[in-house]
A protein has these predicted regions:
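Membrane-proximal helix-turn-helix segments that form the acceptor-binding/catalytic region
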Residues: 17-54, 69
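Acidic anion/phosphate-binding donor-loop and adjacent secondary structure
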Residues: 66, 81-97, 146
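Conserved donor-binding/catalytic core segment of Leloir-type glycosyltransferases
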Residues: 99-117, 123-127
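Nucleotide-activated donor-binding/catalytic signature segment of Leloir-type glycosyltransferases, i.e.
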Residues: 139-162
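Short alpha-helical donor nucleotide-sugar binding micro-motif in glycosyltransferases
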Residues: 166-171
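Aromatic "clamp/platform" in nucleotide-sugar-dependent glycosyltransferases that forms part
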Residues: 179
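Short hydrophobic beta-strand element within catalytic cores of glycosyltransferases
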Residues: 196-199
Length: 235
């Protein structure tokens, strides 16, 4: 029933789901006995369609689809796109408003911040950076903002794409330490605004990197992220 199974290292979806270690994760299932029934119901529903072409937003997901009970169906990859009339270099007074004029801004953006999005990796990164740097995280809850260490600046979610583009532009580096993802468009948005990106090599993340100034590192290698970030301060 899982949306993601990377962190759980589960491959039951290839054959038959039964015991689920992520029973309460979205979308929550409240009875272990329902896991097997749900899997079989979905198998019957999808494989009962005679003429179907599957569309995935990444090659990574397309490859997984070919390992599932959907493997008999053709799969096409159609990447999600962003609006480059909005996500482009956008000058603003963001640095002045937050008193960050002389700081090297390391940015992170998520709709919901949790362990799989790498929130606590930013905590580790903050300990590795000197006073020239400030980490700015967009999308945090009020509670999360109150719990931040002093060298991380928290901002609640913005519903304005234009404001988000201005924040991307103000940043020096965009860091996406995601542990589970499909095709994160935040990487596309940051690069479109002229900001270099470093992201973990999970899911379809590598497919989002197109700028020669951006890079990927192995999942969980926050030390490599820190080295990349610190190099920017030497320029």
């Amino acid at each position: 029933h899982c949306s993601y199974f990377t962190m759980a290292k589960c491959e039951q979806w290839k054959s038959h789901c039964s015991y689920c270690s992520q029973l309460r994760r979205y979308p929550a299932c409240f009875a272990m006995s329902s896991v097997s029934k749900n899997f079989e119901r979905k198998r019957r529903a999808f494989t009962g369609v005679k003429n179907m072409t599957l569309i995935t937003p990444s090659k990574w997901l397309a490859d997984l689809t070919r390992q599932s009970f959907l493997k008999e169906y053709p799969v096409e990859v159609h990447y999600n796109t962003i609006d480059t009339s909005i996500f482009k270099p956008t000058p603003s007074d963001f640095r002045e408003r937050y008193g960050l004029q002389d700081k090297i801004i390391v940015l992170g953006v998520a709709n919901v911040w949790e362990d799989r999005k790498g929130l606590f990796d930013f905590y580790k990164l903050a300990e590795m950076l000197d006073d020239r740097y400030v980490i700015v995280l967009v999308g945090l809850s009020e509670k999360q903002i109150k719990e931040l260490p002093k060298n991380i600046k928290g901002i609640q979610r913005t519903n304005s794409p234009q404001e988000l583009a201005a924040i991307y532009t103000a940043a020096d580096i965009f860091v996406n330490p995601t542990y589970e993802d499909n095709y994160p468009t935040v990487n596309l948005e940051a690069q479109a605004c002229g900001t270099k990106v470093i992201t973990y090599d999970t899911g379809g993340c590598k497919e989002t990197i197109y700028s020669l100034r951006s890079t990927i590192v192995a999942v969980g290698c926050i030390q490599n992220v820190a080295e990349f970030v610190l190099k920017q301060g030497k320029k």
